[in-house]
Amino acid sequence: MSLLNTPLHELDPDVAAAVDAELDRQQSTLEMIASENFAPVAVMEAQGSVLTNKYAEGYPGRRYYGGCEHVDVVEQIAIDRVKALFGAEHANVQPHSGAQANAAAMFALLKPGDTIMGLNLAHGGHLTHGMKINFSGKLYNVVPYHVGDDGQVDMAEVERLAKETKPKLIVAGWSAYPRQLDFAAFRKVADEVGAYLMVDMAHFAGLVAAGLHPNPVPHAHVVTTTTHKTLGGPRGGVILSTAELAKKINSAVFPGQQGGPLEHVVAAKAVAFKVAASEDFKERQGRTLEGARILAERLVRDDAKAAGVSVLTGGTDVHLVLVDLRDSELDGQQAEDRLHEVGITVNRNAVPNDPRPPMVTSGLRIGTPALATRGFTAEDFAEVADVIAEALKPSYDAEALKARVKTLADKHPLYPGLNK
């Protein structure tokens, strides 16, 4: 048999075994990392299609390679769907990731040395919003803003810093923040100082698509997002912008940042955008929010407080909960490991003014999108929230909690058709 037509399990059993093991891990544990989700089988089929073979530098109708007539159709479908989904004038669906979408947007709007403002990483921002060792911190003069004592973005500080430093770009967005941002207020500040407003909605784009979170598109000059978090599609990025900025954005992506787009991923994005426009998706996003609120409410009860556990801002408006462990006997790493032990995957996360190192931290970021995609109901979320609360106590029964997790995982089978 030609190697071209040899199945993975025959051609490379080592890689196949690792893939099978990962499938088993996803099926048998509860995924609660806020930035992770489960892509529909149709999305994975598109991403694993023959489109992976095609080079297509350029844009639909304007390629530097022949034979692009079919990938042109696919990419235009993706563009049209995401524009309709968010009400955008322009969309570029080629960025390979959210970080590259942010980089391209900044390249389109800025020159090296220009001043930008973004939420401080330790207060919930993202690497690409101005971290010193990231491209954004190296190429631009970064003025970070912060959360106040209540754990929410201090808009008075944003306005003051903007007037003092006159940034060319203000970034509104986050990677670990449990509340909604006031996009109109950000735009007002941006207009007052002559800055562009860029919103990074990577985490909450699915909620926006479902009409359960304010849409930043009417307020921002540019909006970036990933396609795999709450949107639940393939791993990739998208840039939305005004029509006025379309040419700058496209040029910054290609040839500015990337060469050939990954058209198999673009196809998967197109499928994900169709899913995101469905009633099923909207219902799922509702359960995502409900699950996060149930979790937050469980972790502010007296028994959790007695264990030194608290919830930043006292609750959540989005798909994640930030747990503060500064008064607990556990640090973030230990808490992550303990939940992993019982079958729940989360990630340690810094809290504002965290006294511990970044690889240890004093907090956890816990999200509900993947479990909502899996079919979890309010009753299921109440059960998993109780398991988490019990696991974070000084004394816990690991075996009993593992059994409860297994019951939940078995109740909601994941990708049963993929089992060999």
UniProtKB/Swiss-Prot annotation:
Cofactor: pyridoxal 5'-phosphate
Pfam family, one: SHMT
Catalysed conversion reaction: (6R)-5,10-methylene-5,6,7,8-tetrahydrofolate + glycine + H2O = (6S)-5,6,7,8-tetrahydrofolate + L-serine
Keyword Amino-acid biosynthesis: yes
EC number: 2.1.2.1
Listed GO CC annotations: cytoplasm; cytosol
SUPFAM superfamilies: PLP-dependent transferases
Gene3D superfamilies: Aspartate Aminotransferase, domain 1, Type I PLP-dependent aspartate aminotransferase-like (Major domain)
GO MF term list: glycine hydroxymethyltransferase activity; pyridoxal phosphate binding
Site (Plays an important role in substrate specificity): H228
UniProt similarity note: Belongs to the SHMT family.
Protein name: Serine hydroxymethyltransferase
Organism: Streptomyces coelicolor (strain ATCC BAA-471 / A3(2) / M145)
